[in-house]
Amino acid sequence: HIGAENPGHGRGKARGLAFVDALLAGTELDDEFPGIDIHVPRSVVIGTDVFDEFLEANRLRMLALRPSNDEWLTWAFLTAKLPAYVITDLQVFLERVRDPIAVRSSSLLEDSQYHPFAGIYSTHMIPNNHPDARIRLAQLCDAIKLVYASTFHTPARRYLELTPHRIEEEKMAVVLQPVVGTPHDNCYYPNFGGVARSYNYYPFGRMKPEDGVVSVALGLGKIVVEGGPALRFSPAHPQVLPQLADGKSFLEQSQREFFAVDLSRPERGPGVNPDQALVAFDLEVAERHGTLAPVA
């Protein structure tokens, strides 16, 4: 953890990860699924106190709170400096992590029960494979600053206007995690990724709403989060798959491409577009990698 704030006392993804990690430590899930390692990826949380310090030290708070051009605001954040102790800790982190890194937002207001903030703030991925450690550090610092800047971008402002909250209340922590996956040629991705929900609003057959529902897809979970074609099933009844009318319907509603981290351009740092480091491939590429058959 970077900063004085305890991640377990925070909000958003940071607190959720700390809770799940503690929960797994007190269970025997590994015994129930031999050969499968169930754990939370190694994570570093940059606390909201660092966010406050960054705004104050670079005199960004007043600029950030005023409605302004997103590009100008982003430039102001990118040219600002992170605290020296944060940079030192990030250097240590990069010495231990050589996989691609997900730089994720974890805001104070994310846990709002009636106003979900999913997709409002940025998550950036960096390939983390440049041979120069200084460039890898600079890319990581830029990704953190871009997450900070997204706190005050127009989409976030407009969404907050629909809630009882004000932008002055928001604070941003950042979660750094190695991307789970395996390198293949010039890309990096997991065998599958997805989202699990504890309540299924559309059960059928033997399914019960409280059984939950899982949506998974080959590669990174981006296609699932964006509502693209993915496989949905109940963890309690994994053999019960969606029943469609005919083979044509199955083909139309099946995944046709997958997303991976692009490893071919290590010199390319994070940009305004959070998906800049990602690349989409046809399924033929996964077949060549040997990753399609186990999940198809």
PLM segments and residue spans:
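Conserved mixed alpha/beta core segments that line enzyme active sites in large multi-domain catalysts
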Residues: 1-32, 81-296
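An N-terminal structural lobe/cap that precedes and organizes the functional/catalytic core
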Residues: 30-40
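A structural-propensity feature for long, helix-poor, extended segments
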Residues: 41-90, 159
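Hydrophobic residues on conserved beta-strands that form the core of alpha/beta folds
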Residues: 40-41, 176
